[in-house]
Amino acid sequence: MSWTEIVIEVARTHAEALSDALMEAGALSVSVEDADFGTDAEQPLFGEPGMEPTEAAWEHSRVVALTPVEADQAAIVAEAAQAVGLAATDVAFTLRAVEEQDWVRLTQSQFEPIHIGKNIWVVPSWHDAPDPQALVLELDPGLAFGTGSHPTTRLCMEWLEAHPPVGLSVLDYGCGSGILAMVAAKLGSTDVIGIDIDPQAIKSALFNTERNHCEVAYYLPDEFASSGHAHTFDVVVANILANPLKVMAPMLSGRVKPGGKLILSGVLATQVEEVSAAYAPFIKLSVWAEHEGWVALAGQLPPGPESGQA
């Protein structure tokens, strides 16, 4: 089957309403892009929990609607334009064909083995490991965050490789796919816990961990609180985002044993000062490494009696 895309360039004020109207008029899907992408006028829009973007579209937006090839695209545009109070003649559009493809093969071709650090490979299931003697994780792109391709995941993996947690306990908070927990287990940790607020992430992590023959226990936060497991760890890793990390500073710091280490990522280089300040009452953090504008922060508690929180 083939499809036809309707491409419309509009001002920000009409982008969201026109997108909804195109869906109502019969489009199969609609996306909004920056019409100036790749030019000097490109306008980045991004956010994170507690810091959402103030605008839902770009000043100069491109609305792309996917339709069946046999549909009347002009009628769809006219109906959508009328719904948002525009004359059909005021909404210029172009059409482009989308041919049928082998989407499985196309998707697989976009994911090659990833080499991380000195000796870690993340390998999709349809590839062979380039170096079977390396630390190899078989991991397919899926529903949970974490395949090693993002700089923050890479930074945490490189830290773990540089500081092998042999015989130590490790907490991966915000575990996503379980990739960091699995690396810790393969590097010698004998007690690895992964925690995530998303049940789907826990499901994905369990699947990945079984596939990779690792020993990791995964919990939702409330489940961990009642698990009876020790609540402090030799190493705590959290690859989330700056704002949640700041909010969780007392809790995450309290999970670190005296003499233990805390590693944070999901932090932009421009956010180092504010994140470090949030943790300053509990632990001193410094930049361990930076990659593509993202950093890993690391710190160590002084040795002493355990005082972690439950």
Curated annotation (Swiss-Prot):
Q: Which keywords annotate this record?
A: Cytoplasm, Methyltransferase, S-adenosyl-L-methionine, Transferase
What cellular component terms from Gene Ontology apply here? Answer: cytosol
Q: What is its EC number?
A: 2.1.1.-
Q: List the disulfide bonds.
A: none
Name the principal localization, coarsely classed. cytoplasm
- Keyword check for Methyltransferase: yes
Report the superkingdom from the record.
Answer: Bacteria
**InterPro entries in alphabetical order:** Ribosomal_L11_MeTrfase_PrmA (IPR050078), Ribosomal_PrmA_MeTrfase (IPR004498), SAM-dependent_MTases_sf (IPR029063)
Q: Which GO terms describe its biological process?
A: methylation
Where in the cell is the protein located?
Answer: Cytoplasm
Q: Where are the transmembrane segments?
A: none
**Pfam families in the cross-refs:** PrmA
The catalysed reaction is:
L-lysyl-[protein] + 3 S-adenosyl-L-methionine = N(6),N(6),N(6)-trimethyl-L-lysyl-[protein] + 3 S-adenosyl-L-homocysteine + 3 H(+)
Which molecular function term from Gene Ontology is one that the record holds?
protein-lysine N-methyltransferase activity
Binding positions for S-adenosyl-L-methionine?
A: T153, G174, D196, N239
- Family, per the entry? Belongs to the methyltransferase superfamily. PrmA family.
Reported function: Methylates ribosomal protein L11.
Instruction: Name it.
Output: Ribosomal protein L11 methyltransferase
Q: What is the lineage of its organism?
A: Bacteria, Pseudomonadati, Pseudomonadota, Betaproteobacteria, Burkholderiales
Q: Which gene encodes it?
A: prmA
